[in-house]
């Protein structure tokens, strides 16, 4: 195993590489246990703390640029897995990310993560069906759209897919698709409000001290959208189907009804 305490350009004899034009030398731990793993860091990235482990081979971590406070991640990347962190992603506390078995965890741009959060595309251990011997908890991709707010202690599990502009409530658990511009809460998380938009300015830190309506803030217009109803959208896309009336069946039913009523 190779352990590094700085994030800078690096390459070893096992094909593990780090491409980082900017050096990060504080609160950094990178462990390579396999080969052909790679870290790609944008020149304008801002990293507050990173504990990164590549357990196997062919893993990838991509860290995008950020003009905001340095993020804090504990990341595990397994065989053939990928973790992507978009532009201006922030964390209040430490966020754990786990991706193994070829899956991808992708965080879009301007994602705001609170504290005590976990993003797990796998369960860490295999569960099998006793009769068939087949695995029942496969790892699955996790996708977080742009400008998503993940509340404190919320957890995203395998299969989570969150649309742009949405809010995940405190302590919620997401393991399915959540539409854009909604508030989703609970375990498992369910949509409780649609057609919402949120903005980063803190209620107390940023003026004005009262924000009763949108006139008090500067809108991030690209994320002020109506929620797309997936079921309605799918229905409008379905072609009309012509169903021929089953005349024979109708006639036989009428004849039978006539016999019963004595008509």
What does each model-found stretch correspond to?
Residues 1-121, 145-147, 164, 180, ...:
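Domain-scale signature associated with acetyltransferase and cell-envelope carbohydrate enzymes
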Residues 137-143, 156:
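Solenoidal tandem-repeat scaffolds enriched in leucines and small polar residues
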Residues 154-164, 174-175:
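Beta-rich strand-turn-strand
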Residues 129-138:
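Short helix/strand-bridging catalytic loops that position acidic/His residues to coordinate divalent metals
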Residues 167, 183-185:
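Short-chain dehydrogenase/reductase
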């Amino acid at each position: 195993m190779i352990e590094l305490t700085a994030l800078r350009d690096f390459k070893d004899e096992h094909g593990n590489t780090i491409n980082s034009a900017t050096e990060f030398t504080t609160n950094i731990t990178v462990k390579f246990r396999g080969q052909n793993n790679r870290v790609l860091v944008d020149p304008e990235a801002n990293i507050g703390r990173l504990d990164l482990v590549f357990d196997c081979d062919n893993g990838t971590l991509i860290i995008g640029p950020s003009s905001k406070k340095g993020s804090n991640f504990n990341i595990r990347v397994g065989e053939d897995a990928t973790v992507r962190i978009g532009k201006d992603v922030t964390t209040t506390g430490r966020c754990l990310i786990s991706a193994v078995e070829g899956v991808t965890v992708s965080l879009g741009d301007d994602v705001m993560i609170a504290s005590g959060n976990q993003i797990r595309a796998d369960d860490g251990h295999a569960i099998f069906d006793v009769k068939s011997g087949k695995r029942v908890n496969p790892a699955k991709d996790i996708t977080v759209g742009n400008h998503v707010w993940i509340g404190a202690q919320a957890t995203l599990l395998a299969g989570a897919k969150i649309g742009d502009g949405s809010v995940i409530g405190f302590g919620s658990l997401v393991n399915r698709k959540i539409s854009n511009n909604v508030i989703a809460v609970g375990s498992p998380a369910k949509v409780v409000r649609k057609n919402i938009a949120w903005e980063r300015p803190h209620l107390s830190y940023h003026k004005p001290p009262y924000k009763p309506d949108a006139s008090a803030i500067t809108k991030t217009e690209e994320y002020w959208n109506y929620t797309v109803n997936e079921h309605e959208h799918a229905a409008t896309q379905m072609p009309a189907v012509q169903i021929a009336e089953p005349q024979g069946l109708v006639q036989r039913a009428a004849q039978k009804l006539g016999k019963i009523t004595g008509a």
